[in-house]
């Protein structure tokens, strides 16, 4: 009740002040337009005497401005004490417009009284403009009291609440990868750094096509790790994009290595620009389990659906058969024919020749006992089905170019050997990825085993477009390679793609064991998963209630997503969110980032223009300068076939001539 009385009293005071303001307005008109009022018959003697006394004692009418100023002062005071109903449509631009118009009409109209249109006409025009100006000033004042000063729609996307301070220090060490950034915080853009001080805890780079994964991050990984003397293995899905960067950067930074590294290329498309390497080199296979790993990798790369069916009979059977063939070639004459093309050719011999030869060796007899039981039990259909499961997919890999590359031994796959460091790039082709991925997957699995050892050179494994190739043992490499100084960087589009091609279990392991995460624009479940990974932060919430008489504002706080999924789904090109890992002696308090990775485009373009193409490695020309590429690789292709035919004939003859083994030959 008391509050209502106070409000009522305040209203009366404001009305009184507005009344005084109107009186000053009328006095101004009466005094300075007196002749017009006299003509109209609106003068009063008592008013004249009062105004004359004011003039003698105060000089109030010595200038036309004084009464106007008093009028505006009291008008302002009356408006300040007025509480109007808040209105969202009233804006400062509208208020300033009417105030400016009011000022012009109210204060800048004195010259109208001197117009040569007669006293009455000039006075009428003056009074009209003065009144119009007063009304405009009154409107502006009332609108100020009705202005909604707390506009909750200024930050419709909650940008301020979701911006946060990020790392601004540059933290370098002998292994680190450092990326300059720009991030938004407290209404301005700031310069910062993403410091991957421990790349051995693995990194993954996600983003839809065109989000800038390779340009902003993967390329920087390659360059900076070469500058710091890493041995390197690069899977280049769109050969030679990454390969040329690695080759040219290595040329300019050979001094970063204690022992000069060699640059090697595996490229099935162009044998001229490819070294030759045998991924199942017998020197690096110590046990039949190594043969099994190789067979497993090949078959799962050729049959991606098998990844989800590991352990099934018709999945394991062809893998075991191929593993037995690889191990046989390893032990036969000290691995003279132990290459993948020889294994394919041997598998394509009739099973009546394959099984007697393989089971004639004691170490393979037990390994192949299920096949022999089926053969001896007359289950020919089952046996043929098992063999066909291996033959059909492997037949897709019969290619002279592939045979050429995989039967040579230009280098070994121990890329981080301190005495022979290497930078190896393997190139795929999107048009032939189903064929090449199986062979390249074999290189991957062998490299993983060879580099994950103690007392080797620091090394890096960079896989662009990971789902295009099945990388056997990748989850184990990520989990165990840190102590062996192996840095893994994986590039792919989103988690659903990884789950589709690697299976749910292996995909989850990869997602949850990687320590450094970069993500450009991703959508759906991937965005939600990342948002949950980045966690929540205390955010301010403001609400407003407006009624006829008053406005009330409430401010509260609540935990909400630091980087919501909707933000991750709408990141612009070059903008990344993520988190990094730190070390015991290099603590990073703010590991999460949401920033634009700064790339000097002009510098990068200049570097790329100066790049040298990867040189010709093998010269396929005759003395008369004619090209003999086709003849050479075809001759190698025929040689592999002939060597297997000869091997089979010799082995069959050996078995027939040995009384203890002769029973293996079924007539």
Kindly give the residue locations of the regions a language model identified.
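Short, surface-exposed recognition loops or helix-turn segments adjacent to catalytic cores
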Residues: 54-59, 339-343, 407, 545-549
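Active-site-adjacent beta-strand anchor residues
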Residues: 15, 235-236, 520
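Basic- and hydrophobic-enriched, low-structure N-terminal and domain-boundary segments
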Residues: 1-211, 215, 220, 547-548, ...
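N-terminal charged/capping segments associated with class I S-adenosyl-L-methionine
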Residues: 593-597
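P-loop NTPase motor domains
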Residues: 148-157, 194-486, 502, 568-572, ...
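Intrinsically disordered, low-complexity segments enriched in serine, threonine, and glycine
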Residues: 589-591
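Hydrophobic alpha-helical segments involved in membrane association or supramolecular assembly
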Residues: 76-79, 441, 445, 516, ...
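Conserved ATP-driven motor cores of ASCE-family P-loop NTPases powering translocation/secretion/packaging/pilus
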Residues: 478-480, 484-581
